[in-house]
Amino acid sequence: MTVLDIGAWDGFFSFEAERRGAKRVLATDSFCWGGEGWGTKAGFELARKALNSRVEDMEIDVLDICRDKVGVFDIVLFLGVLYHMRHPLLALERVFSVTGNQLILETHVDMLLTEGPVMKFYPGAELANDPTNWWGPNPVAVETMLKTVGFRSVKIVSQWPVVPYKVGKGVRLKIKKHWPFFQKIQQSRMVFHAWR
């Protein structure tokens, strides 16, 4: 089995894939490793040395990823990256092009109470005070985008936190920080699996 970890940063999931028996693992990043972001590649290098790992690395932007540059992988990890992309559908097209079998995608989601596919746009630092957070798709939008770029099957495998917790947190934030109650209960994080 081969694994591509897009947006690997410190490589936690890359090294875990290797530990679990992947014969080839390629970790990629550009935002953190290239100095543009707030992270660096130092943690990845330290872990690779400490683990005596054979995980490969490549500094490459998501939008530059293609078969010619990285190859095709059985499993592609795209964890915590989608909502940072200025062009999310184009990013998913690139991800699809190098996925041999399965994509595992984790992302921030918003507008959970909206039935159709929609995405919330965050100009500035509206989401978590981070100016690199651009989008909050709802689950239907994520599924629709994945199918639009070519994945034949998509499944939500994890969503958190559960509704009672979200309502309690929303009330607490409303009281303490005067944050909009409904905004908080409409946001979450989800994991999707998609197959070619």
Q: What positions do the PLM features span?
A:
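Conserved SAM-binding site of S-adenosyl-L-methionine-dependent methyltransferases, i.e.
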Residues: 82
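A structural micro-motif
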Residues: 1, 23, 53-55, 101-102, ...
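Conserved class I S-adenosyl-L-methionine
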Residues: 1-9
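Conserved Rossmann-like nucleotide-binding pocket used by diverse enzymes
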Residues: 4, 26, 56-58, 77, ...
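Long alpha-helical scaffolds
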Residues: 8, 14-17, 22, 91, ...
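S-adenosyl-L-methionine-dependent methyltransferase catalytic module, highlighting the catalytic core
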Residues: 63-69, 73, 77-78, 86-196
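Class I SAM-dependent methyltransferase SAM/SAH-binding core
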Residues: 12-59, 64
